Amino acid sequence: MKKDVILWAGAGQIGMAIARRIGTGKKIIVGDKKLENAESIAKIMNEVGFDVVPVQMDLSDKTSILKFVETGQTYGEVAMFINAAGVSPSQASVETILKVDLYGTAVLLEEVGKIIKEGGVGVTISSQSGHRMPQLTAEEDEMLACTPTEELLSLEMLQPENIKDTLHAYQMAKRCNEKRVMYEAVKWGILQKYVCKMPGRQTGNSR
């Protein structure tokens, strides 16, 4: 009998804490850009009784994301989703931050939403940085939430001349994460599936 599957992006300590809490009896697929990171985390968890498979997954690459989701489906129905992947403003360029933290997260939410089982749950790690920036207009928030994924990086507000530095790029990415989770929660099915953003708020309904 196949187990329910947890898709977990970003092999770090926050993701592991969540996976340990919800992963008993589940097949856990952990993806990270650096396979050795995923392998290290999988080893730690497997040694204490979890069932974890490490894979390489690049959050900036849609093909890699699709392969990650497909790999999870080979083990069973995807019932849970953890997105703890991303880069920080001290690690990466403006372009990379927007490609990974903003675009990649939007793709991952969209693709997991297409296949997650009824009653499935998901969590995306965000940041207070999304609120530590100048106020966006309602129209700008709506664009971050609802623009087709492949058009997100073409938005005027995300063009190089409108992004001051890596911190600003990170703030915009995290603001987009929040709005995208709200948008995808509706598509996932508010009364049957549940998505939340950390820290702070949650959207959807646990019933």
Regions found by a protein language model. Name each.
Residues 50-51, 71-83, 90-91, 117-120:
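A glycine-rich helix->loop->beta "capping" turn
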Residues 89-91, 118-194, 199-207:
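Catalytic loop of short-chain dehydrogenase/reductase
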Residues 25-40:
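Conserved glycine-rich Rossmann-like NAD(P)H-binding loop of the short-chain dehydrogenase/reductase
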Residues 1-29:
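Canonical Rossmann dinucleotide-binding motif of NAD(H)/NADP(H)-dependent dehydrogenases/reductases
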Residues 60-76:
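Conserved Rossmann-fold cofactor-binding substructure of NAD(P)-dependent oxidoreductases
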